[in-house]
C-alpha cells in the first residue's frame, strides 16, 4: 500500500519509502521501523489499524454511515465492503495482541480503564536534530478490542521531546467524547 493511491473517497498523499539496491543496511533498518525517508499519512495508519481489527481484511473506507433528509427518512446508507486482504488472520491476531499490550501495559496505558477497551500503537518520528530534538507524536488504534467498532489515528506534528505521548492523550479525549 506504499507508493500507491489509497482506497476511499479522500484524495490523500501517497505514503512512501525510498529504498533501492544502493541503500545501506542502516537505511534499510531505519525504513523498516518507519524512520528514515518513510512518509505515511494518518489516513493510511487508520486503514492499517482497521485491517488488524478486521482480522487482516482492509475494508473500503467511507466517511458517513448514513444520510437522512429533513423528515428523518434515510436517503443513503453505506454498507461495509471488503477492499482487500492485507495480512493473514494469524498475523492480524498477533498484531492485535501486541497492540492490546501497548494500551494495557505500555506507552498507550493512558487509555487503560476507560469505558471502552482499546488497542493501539504509539510512535515518535524524529525529524530535526540541528536545533534540538523535534518529533511527531503518533497514535493509531481501535476500540472495543473483542468486537472492534471504531478506528482512530492521531498525529501531533512539531512537538518538542517532552510531548512524546501527546497523540495518545488526544486520542483518549476524542474517544471519551465519542463514547460518553
Language model segments and positions:
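Short, gly/Ser/Thr-rich active-site loops of penicillin-recognizing serine hydrolases
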Residues: 74-81, 168-180
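Beta-lactam-recognizing serine transpeptidase/beta-lactamase-like catalytic domain environment
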Residues: 1-156
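Short, conserved glycine- and acidic-residue-centered signature motifs
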Residues: 41, 164-167
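Short beta-strands and strand-coil junctions in structured, solvent-facing domains, enriched
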Residues: 160-162
Amino acid at each position: 500500500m506504499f507508493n500507491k493511491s489509497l482506497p476511499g473517497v479522500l484524495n490523500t498523499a501517497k505514503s512512501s519509502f525510498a529504498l533501492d539496491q544502493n541503500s545501506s543496511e542502516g537505511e534499510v533498518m531505519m525504513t523498516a521501523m518507519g524512520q528514515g525517508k518513510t512518509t505515511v499519512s494518518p489516513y493510511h495508519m487508520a486503514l492499517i489499524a482497521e485491517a488488524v481489527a478486521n482480522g487482516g481484511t482492509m475494508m473500503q473506507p467511507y466517511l458517513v454511515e448514513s444520510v437522512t433528509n429533513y423528515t428523518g427518512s434515510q436517503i443513503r446508507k453505506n454498507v461495509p465492503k471488503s477492499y482487500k486482504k492485507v495480512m493473514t488472520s494469524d498475523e492480524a491476531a498477533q498484531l492485535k495482541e501486541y497492540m492490546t499490550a501497548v494500551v494495557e501495559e505500555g506507552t498507550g496505558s493512558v487509555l487503560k480503564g476507560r469505558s471502552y477497551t482499546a488497542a493501539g500503537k504509539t510512535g515518535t518520528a524524529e525529524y530535526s536534530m540541528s536545533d534540538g530534538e523535534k518529533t511527531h507524536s503518533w497514535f493509531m488504534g481501535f476500540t472495543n478490542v473483542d468486537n472492534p467498532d471504531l478506528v482512530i489515528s492521531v498525529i501531533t506534528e512539531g512537538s518538542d521531546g517532552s510531548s512524546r505521548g501527546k497523540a495518545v492523550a488526544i486520542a483518549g479525549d476524542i474517544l471519551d467524547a465519542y463514547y460518553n
